[in-house]
């Protein structure tokens, strides 16, 4: 049996795919090469500022993802199972942080929770606490831009669960909470876990909203992406530091992507 030779169209498509893949590969390869080639970049990896920014990123993203799961899960289930007044408006509001530029999200948060904001001014008058430019502001910004990704994935997971299974369990005497915990969540675990990983990845890479709402204060609000900007713009670490910080972010992103793939495979199994 003779093998068919690839057609001209197939070769052209393969060439375009190769060029497209190299377009994404070379920037990351260049980053790794620069980090390995420049001893200053390797030295910057041991700088205390890098560890501080990494710790702040991990702590704030852990809190923001927890908040996203805590509040986003019931919202996603509500949107998947119920027709509520204003549901379309809520649905659109959840899409806005995804499609808006992060800087616009930061300005919106500032006008709402800033010292002269819609809610920020009365809160400060009552409590004396100002939210902007604090670590809590970092968490708020991350949650604002990342939580909708989790809600979208969770909603899709809940919609894929057959409502008849929940109804049968209810007729057998199970409470709504028991049905949700023992039937709905396990059946939707794949999308729920994938959404949580996506939420974490988005929160980890958040820059614009955090910069405007929380600032870029070393040791207080400076997460890894903000530390990259500070180093690139002439900070103490300089360009080698920006390369080193970018490499750390790249490594964390790869771990997240591998986790997402594993979760997706287990969810489909």
Question: Predicted segment positions?
Answer:
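Periplasmic/extracellular loop-to-transmembrane helix junction in inner-membrane transport proteins
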Residues: 2-11, 29-66, 78-87, 230-240
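Membrane-interfacial helix termini and adjacent extracytoplasmic/periplasmic loops
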Residues: 2-3, 39, 87, 106-143, ...
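C-terminal transmembrane helix and the adjacent membrane-cytosol boundary/short C-terminal tail
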Residues: 2-13, 23-27, 86, 152-166, ...
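Transmembrane-helix boundary motif in ABC transporter permease subunits
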Residues: 4, 43, 63-94, 107, ...
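Interhelical loop and adjacent transmembrane-helix boundary motif
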Residues: 4-10, 41-42, 48, 211-255, ...
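Transmembrane alpha-helices
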Residues: 15-16, 21, 66, 96, ...
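Hydrophobic alpha-helical transmembrane segments of multipass integral membrane proteins
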Residues: 22, 55, 59-71, 75, ...
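Non-cytoplasmic
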Residues: 27, 191-230
């Amino acid at each position: 049996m003779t093998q068919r030779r690839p057609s001209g169209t197939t070769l052209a498509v393969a060439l375009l795919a190769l060029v497209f893949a190299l377009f994404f590969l070379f920037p990351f390869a260049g980053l790794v090469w620069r980090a390995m080639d420049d001893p200053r970049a390797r030295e910057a990896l041991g700088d205390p500022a890098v560890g501080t920014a990494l710790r702040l990123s991990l702590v704030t993203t852990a809190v923001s993802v927890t908040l996203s799961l805590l509040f986003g899960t019931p919202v996603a289930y509500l949107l998947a199972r119920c027709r509520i007044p204003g549901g379309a408006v809520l649905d659109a509001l959840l899409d806005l942080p995804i499609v808006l530029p992060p800087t616009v999200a930061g300005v919106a948060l500032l006008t709402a929770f800033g010292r002269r904001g819609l809610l920020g001014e009365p809160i400060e008058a009552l409590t004396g606490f100002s939210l902007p430019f604090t670590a809590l502001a970092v968490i708020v910004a991350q949650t604002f831009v990342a939580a909708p990704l989790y809600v979208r994935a969770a909603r899709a997971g809940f919609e894929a669960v057959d409502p008849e299974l929940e109804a049968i369990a209810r007729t057998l005497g199970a409470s709504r909470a028991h049905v949700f915990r023992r039937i709905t969540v396990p059946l939707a675990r794949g999308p729920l876990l994938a959404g949580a990983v996506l939420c974490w990845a988005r929160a980890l890479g958040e820059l614009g909203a955090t910069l405007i709402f929380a600032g870029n204060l070393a040791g207080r609000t400076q997460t890894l992406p903000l530390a990259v900007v500070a180093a690139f713009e002439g900070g103490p670490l300089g360009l080698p530091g920006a390369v080193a910080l970018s490499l750390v972010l790249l490594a964390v992103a790869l771990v997240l992507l591998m986790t997402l793939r594993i979760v997706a495979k287990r969810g489909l199994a």
